[in-house]
Amino acid sequence: MRTIQVTTPGVQYPVYLGSGLLPQVASRLRKLTAPNSRIFIVTSPEIWALWGKKLLSGFGKSSPEVLFLPAGEAHKRMASVEKLATALSESGADRSSLLIAFGGGILGDLTGFLAAIYMRGIDYVQIPTTLLAQVDSSVGGKTGANLSTGKNLIGSFHHPRAVFADVDVLHTLPPRELRAGLQECVKAGIIRDAALFSYMERNAETILAADDAALTRVIAAAVRMKADVVQQDEREGGLRMILNYGHTLGHAIETVTHYRGLLHGEAVGWGMLAATELSRMRGLLTAAQSERMQRVILAYGPLPRFRAKAEALLEATARDKKNRAGTRRFVLAEKIGHATIVEDVTEAELRAVIAWLLQRVREAGQLREVGA
């Protein structure tokens, strides 16, 4: 087992990474909670059917209460938060209670937000069950819910007490889910870890085969990168924005397709292709550098096609959380392993890269079309 510490000015917590962690969760939680504290697990029926017994095996007779939330982006909304909060209240949860977010990134984000606001804040831990959640959303304290007008427009910073990333759960992931999570790992390499990027470039076949050693190496590198960034910029005042590489257009794609058909990592994959091309258009990358990045992004595809109008994507980017005072901020690459935040992207440049992206989508004879 590897342990990676996430340290900020106000909090420190461990990310445990390895095989066979689920039965160990209960014993480690005893060190984090007061005697007789209530523990509540928030999970989906699907995850519980696969891994619930394994997680409960360490609790003995003092089994936590389980609250179910259906999987899917459509349930990442305030109505779900209210429903879960009501269930906690009816069950007698108090300020000493602890929540366990046992699922993918959507469930983890929502459970973290619930923990942040229930009784003005209670503790929680993350047990991410997708690769994307293990390397990204479970680390760093961002929590939230979606509005109809955009993704994660309601939320707070609320760090977990611990993260348990058990690689065993990844073996039940559909291959498409695994590939979507690997897009976030490619992102980590592009923005801040050239060695990780090169490793993923050389070992795509082994990584895509879900080799334990290869996956653990990639996950550990991505988590360390994010922990380092969060330590330097907890509240996204500057450096932490680089973690949004590919997310400006990625979130726009999710918004205009109504969160249907594309997984988050797939939308980010398309967004990274666009960000890489915009970096080339601006002269930050050479054509060779841009092509190399795009080859590795596509090596962890295929990316599903989607249908969207350029104007709809343009409008969605205007609501991006990175924007300030009407200025569109973009995270662009300067070289492999280094990203920068650009604040002067013009509408003309954005229209040009959206046109380029939609042409690439039309040319992609992969999977199926989604969206409307």
From Swiss-Prot:
It is an enzyme of class 4 (lyase). The gene is aroB. NCBIfam families: aroB. Its EC number is 4.2.3.4. It comes from Acidobacterium capsulatum (strain ATCC 51196 / DSM 11244 / BCRC 80197 / JCM 7670 / NBRC 15755 / NCIMB 13165 / 161). The keyword Metal-binding applies. One of its GO terms (cellular component) is cytoplasm. Belongs to the sugar phosphate cyclases superfamily. Dehydroquinate synthase family. Pathway: Metabolic intermediate biosynthesis; chorismate biosynthesis; chorismate from D-erythrose 4-phosphate and phosphoenolpyruvate: step 2/7. CDD domains: DHQS. SUPFAM superfamilies: Dehydroquinate synthase-like (SSF56796). PANTHER family: 3-DEHYDROQUINATE SYNTHASE, 3-DEHYDROQUINATE SYNTHASE, CHLOROPLASTIC. NAD(+) binds at residues 129-130, 142, 151. Its main location: cytoplasm. GO terms for biological process: amino acid biosynthetic process; aromatic amino acid family biosynthetic process; chorismate biosynthetic process. Keywords: Amino-acid biosynthesis, Aromatic amino acid biosynthesis, Cobalt, Cytoplasm, Lyase, Metal-binding, NAD, Nucleotide-binding, Zinc. It is found in: Cytoplasm. Its cofactor is Co(2+); Zn(2+); NAD(+). Gene3D superfamilies: 3.40.50.1970, Dehydroquinate synthase-like - alpha domain. Zn(2+) binds at residues 184, 247, 264. GO terms for molecular function: 3-dehydroquinate synthase activity; metal ion binding; nucleotide binding. Binds 1 divalent metal cation per subunit. Can use either Co(2+) or Zn(2+). This is 3-dehydroquinate synthase.
